[in-house]
Amino acid sequence: MSSLISFIFLFLFSSITASAQNTFYLYHNCSVTTTFSSNSTYSTNLKTLLSSLSSLNASSYSTGFQTATAGQAPDRVTGLFLCRVDVSSEVCRSCVTFAVNETLTRCPKDKEGVFYYEQCLLRYSNRNIVATLNTDGGMFMQSARNPLSVKQDQFRDLVLTPMNLAAVEAARSFKKWAVRKIDLNASQSLYGMVRCTPDLREQDCLDCLKIGINQVTYDKIGGRILLPSCASRYDNYAFYNESNVGTPQDSSPRPGKGGNSSVIIIAVVVPITVLFLLLVAVFSVRAKNKRTLNEKEPVAEDGNDITTAGSLQFDFKAIEAATNCFLPINKLGQGGFGEVYKGTLSSGLQVAVKRLSKTSGQGEKEFENEVVVVAKLQHRNLVKLLGYCLEGEEKILVYEFVPNKSLDHFLFDSTMKMKLDWTRRYKIIGGIARGILYLHQDSRLTIIHRDLKAGNILLDDDMNPKIADFGMARIFGMDQTEAMTRRVVGTYGYMSPEYAMYGQFSMKSDVYSFGVLVLEIISGMKNSSLYQMDESVGNLVTYTWRLWSNGSPSELVDPSFGDNYQTSEITRCIHIALLCVQEDAEDRPTMSSIVQMLTTSLIALAEPRPPGFFFRSKQEQAGPSIDSSTHCSVDEASITRVTPR
């Protein structure tokens, strides 16, 4: 916010309610950079605009929001007013009229102005302000009273989450308005209110409210923030007219006034409640029996679906609360699937929340696939799925929180890579290998990951690797060894030749990706980059093969290691990696063999041949080998490509 004015404000007028007829002035802001003269066309247009806003018919004020324009460019004036939803049309008209009469006194020569009152907002500008987000020139007002019987850090958490939930509700509503009652304890409650101008898009309203809500310090018993496009407030009394807005969502229902209405409510609600409870009991028993049956039945080759993971389902409101309504500051990263946020469940457990982008056409299938696949996996080198949410348009995965981000964050940063010496990197290579072996052989299902890369390897507190992002994974049947697809997904730099060119994938496809990953871990360089040697240019795999052929594989080693590594150990890892990236899938080792090769040096290694996607020099192109370089891309992003058969 460019010009937020912040100060402590004692609420001396706490007895004023939304139904009060007296208009209570709060604050105004004038644009001192653009002015007009008293006899100008703009001055005439502004007076016309203000007069029209204050002389509408009664029905116009009942909506609580109106816009208007006067004149032609460059002297056109656009204006609007917004009244609180809980005030009557008479109070709205009174407030707007009062504001109009004060406008030219408070901002006599300014082309832009915004005026805040307890019951309404008035705004005008020489720019188009309709359906346009503006968070400049706001004000933060705060009570001088401290919270009672609640620690300040607890108080902030108690208030912030409901206010963010109210912001989401307001952004989705037609009137862009929401209230909340927040119970601090058995005897203390707070009341919250958020609002936007109804012309804003849902996302603009939510962004505006989040900016405002997070400007408040929440260390006092009451506070509010006023912005041109939105406002929010909380206090320890009902400062809005509850009868006009309905009971706040978090509060308990109050008893009705009429005896007949109470009888009708009891007569209708009790039978419905009993019927509902009976249905819940029946479906619970059936669901339990179904889960028991599913545990006993063998897994079909293609019969897995998201319903088998029903016990993992989260409520969307719980996820919103955990992430503070997907607060931008909690964002951990973003990919083709969507955004990932850090969250804290009500139990105190930290989680990573992966939210499917609503514009992602491919993400919906990958979402259901990831739930089905990961829900069945348990291994120390695989990220753990805690649950999911499938509610309306929302598709969310909840994972264990892994604090050290992904491997690429360390490998390809000149400063961060210093935290990964060779001992740690060797440990990471072994952990990744064991994780893939579990997917291929040791789990109940045979799973091909199809998108193994540094960005999908997370590191925990002890730098142990955890394979993540199973959106592209495929489950193989009992005797299935390979599959074909017209929909090639993954990351080109890590794809095996047979998969990238023909859509054929198998366990050996993951082995190829693992080989590329090992070379990146050893060198600290990206396979997608180009490297020059002997007047020839190639990717990391090509560069490694040339070094190997010249008898100088140690030149691949990350200089950040210094002399703190065993040459024989690193050379063996390079050798294993080259075996993994062989052009012919049959020439690549299995993951079980790779784990054994990494575990003991007693196993002899085969001599590697030129790898797949090998960039050949002019001299090499003269040979009989087929040049595969035309099929190689340096794109790092996970892609989906449909190929004709």
Curated annotation (Swiss-Prot):
A GO biological process held by the record: response to salicylic acid
Positions in the Extracellular compartment: 21-262
Residue positions, PTM Phosphotyrosine: 399, 499
Conditions for induction: By salicylic acid (SA) or by a bacterial pathogen infection.
Compositionally biased tracts (Polar residues): 620-632
EC number: 2.7.11.-
CDD domains per the UniProt record, alphabetical: Gnk2-like, STKc_IRAK
Signal sequence interval, chain numbering: 1-20
GO CC terms in record: membrane
Domain Protein kinase: 326-603
Superkingdom of this protein's organism: Eukaryota
Sites where the protein binds ATP: 332-340, 354
Catalysis: reaction(s): L-seryl-[protein] + ATP = O-phospho-L-seryl-[protein] + ADP + H(+); L-threonyl-[protein] + ATP = O-phospho-L-threonyl-[protein] + ADP + H(+)
The entry's keywords: ATP-binding, Glycoprotein, Kinase, Membrane, Nucleotide-binding, Phosphoprotein, Receptor, Repeat, Serine/threonine-protein kinase, Signal, Transferase, Transmembrane, Transmembrane helix
Phosphothreonine modified-residue sites: 491
Gnk2-homologous domain sequence ranges: 24-129, 135-239
Quaternary structure (record): Interacts with MWL1.
Protein name (record): Cysteine-rich receptor-like protein kinase 19
Species of origin: Arabidopsis thaliana (Mouse-ear cress)
Upper taxonomic lineage: Eukaryota, Viridiplantae, Streptophyta, Embryophyta, Tracheophyta
